[in-house]
Amino acid sequence: MFCVQCEQTIRTPAGNGCSYSQGMCGKTAETSDLQDLLIAALQGLSAWAAKAREYGIVDHYVDNFAPRAFFSTLTNVNFDSPRIVGYAREAIALREALKAQSLNADANAAVDNPMADLQLVSDDLGDLQRQAAEFTPNKDKAAIGENILGLRLLCLYGLKGAAAYMEHAHVLGQYDNDIYAQYHKIMAWLGTWPSDMNALLECSMEIGQMNFKVMSILDAGETDTYGHPTPTQVNVKATAGKCILISGHDLKDLYNLLQQTEGTGVNVYTHGEMLPAHGYPELRKFKHLVGNYGSGWQNQQVEFARFPGPIVMTSNCIIDPTVGSYDDRIWTRSIVGWPGVSHLEGDDFAPVITQAQQMAGFPFSEIEHMITVGFGRETLLGAADSLIDLVSREKLRHIFLVGGCDGARGERNYFTDFATSVPQDCLILTLACGKYRFNKLDFGDIEGLPRLIDAGQCNDAYSAIILAVTLAEKLGCGVNDLPLSLVLSWFEQKAIVILLTLLSLGVTNIVTGPTAPGFLTPDLLAVLNEKFGLRSVTTVEEDMQQLLSA
């Protein structure tokens, strides 16, 4: 086992990465190794998908399957070894079909890729785990060095984050042939074990640029389907009655669940990154979407254990449900998996609803505590002139984007302390689950404009980017000249690709934490600092002073 993709990875003087019987996320060595095997199979599939496009052969099922299966290897998504192997088998079958079609078009069709002819050696998981050793990402570290390995992983993990957003967009009916062609090209190239530093750096920026397009179509899918989010108050306390909790990012799953629970007497609560759903008109119209439950994903083993109803996981992040003994009432959807828990293959939530009706639910309603969400792209752009007016009248000094992933590390209290230390004449724009560090606090307002503005899920960084570009255009300056600072927390691969997106757009002087990615060497961090001004957090006082004086 070797996995270094998330922020909680093991760090030792000898090197970084989880490499024992189990990773810090709870992933077993078996599952981790089989995920390496799956990635190799997907690289071979992409090699032939890219080749087939040269003959005008475009298989939309392959285009959907490839990033979706890749998404299953993202942190805290799928821990179920047989399902991982199932994805690998399907990838190989799809590859062979594309290969046959390509050979029909050109008898000399061929691809130069070591993954293009991969076959699984056995049906036995142990045999497959041993085969996977051939594809562990650090297998040639001694030959290429830590810097090249780090850049490969930066590209691989960044592309994995983009694949997750591609899947979210596809669920909402969004398809862009150019994006999929670019995805297959990059995925196939990474399967050749590239070792040119400049080419890898260029690839990382290409992934960032591609992801900006992915976020654009995801934004279109969400807003075209459910309307543009508008500021909405959400209760974060319990309401009496039967209940279901839904977590993850998939708004379509939430919509289907709301439709199927309407009139049943079962209330629905959002959790984690599903919180921004309350801002969408077509979702909040359901009166039994009663509120948001819990805090950051890392607290789920305590909070889910206390929730008196079933829980549906639509995407990341799931962690071991046996710890809180709620494994008999947690349900996984789509690419999510945990051994032994119930998995919903389709869009029918009837078994979940039946279980909710059989459980006690909340016995009484707690005193309401409202927070505000729903500052989507249209709302943010509508406030642009007001922001400029406040700046011109010296009522607004600075905007801090404080957001990103949450996690268990104690150093993440930095982000709470930073948010509460922001001066009263400054605004906080936030997004993603990192907001749970401070989103239940009262930050007041500046002339009626809330000082804490929740822009949505991690992918809604797109809205923040569009706002920044709009403000810069109106003020006749560059984005980096705005009174705007980005203080980002990271945990997994979606955060990595958001960072690559920002860097590829030329955004500089971003501050990240709580730690640097374990796969980035000091040399690589120095390159990113020199080229983009990217740096790690220090202390709240030092960072605040530096950002306000920049």
UniProtKB/Swiss-Prot annotation:
One of its GO terms (cellular component) is cytoplasm. It is an enzyme of class 1 (oxidoreductase). Its EC number is 1.7.99.1. Keywords: 2Fe-2S, Cytoplasm, Iron, Iron-sulfur, Metal-binding, Oxidoreductase. The modification Cysteine persulfide is found at residue 405. Disulfide bonds: none annotated. InterPro entries: HCP/CODH (IPR004137), Hydroxylam_reduct (IPR010048), Prismane-like_a/b-sand (IPR016099), Prismane-like_sf (IPR011254), Prismane_a-bundle (IPR016100). Binds 1 [2Fe-2S] cluster. Binds 1 hybrid [4Fe-2O-2S] cluster. Its main location: cytoplasm. Belongs to the HCP family. This is Hydroxylamine reductase.
